[in-house]
Amino acid sequence: MLRHFVPLLCLCLLAVPAWAQSDTVAEPAAAGPAPEKILVVGQRPGPGLWKISKGEHVMWVFGAYSPLPAKMEWRAHEVEAKLSQSQEFLSPPSTGIAAGYGAMTALPFMVGFKNNPDGAMLKDVVPADVYARWLPLKAKYIGENDGIERERPMFASDELFRKGLAHAGLSGNTGIDKKLYEIATKYKVKVTRTGVTTKIESPVKTIRAFKKSTLNDLACFSRSIEQLETDLDAMRIRANAWAKGDIAVIESLKFADRGDACADAVMTSVV
């Protein structure tokens, strides 16, 4: 069940009998999911918490999801109550890049880093059939923008996907991770980060090499287009289901996420 939630955010604490009695379980949906045109707004609780225990040790698991309704605000009362009494907060798994103090010296070299090498256009670097699918989506969600045709597939598809979500009333910037860190900081809970960060020793050299390199980002581009073509309605249903805590609906929907393909394009580049 938990495979449907990315990332998993864990709240680790000692067991308290009263909590075991108040563990929240979402009620199953009465019927299968149907196309939804209206997204939920206002404060919503999300799916609640899952309890994992062994002896006196208890771990509360919170399943995050993205994108969510742009006008929804996560109501964090239940999670705050558990996290405030926790011994440790495990951050969601992630990958990142750190440039250190040399980042400032690399700023002048960042100009044009999103563009394809040697002045190539998008139509020159992606398969013709995929580019033909890109054009109507670009017209619908982005509009006139010649500059984006010079960008690498990964960056162009990211802009397209972001605009597509906004058009559907969704947002990938959920603010949930930030809220969890704020709660942990407020109650002085130990934070254990589970992400992996790649340190760049020479940012200027890396940027120069990156601008000349060819990325393995066609899968990212293709999956972004596929998800906008086939999964947008399902994303709206999942977003509403997460906001309402309707786990049965979330479990019933399958989807091909673009996230892994796009993350791989970055982490397997010259960086």
Place the predicted regions along the sequence by residue.
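Boundary at the C-terminal end of the N-terminal hydrophobic targeting segment
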Residues: A18-S22
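Positively charged n-region of N-terminal signal peptides that target proteins for export
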Residues: M1-H4
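Bacterial N-terminal signal peptides
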Residues: V6-P17
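Structured, acidic catalytic/metal-binding patches in enzyme active sites
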Residues: V25-V270
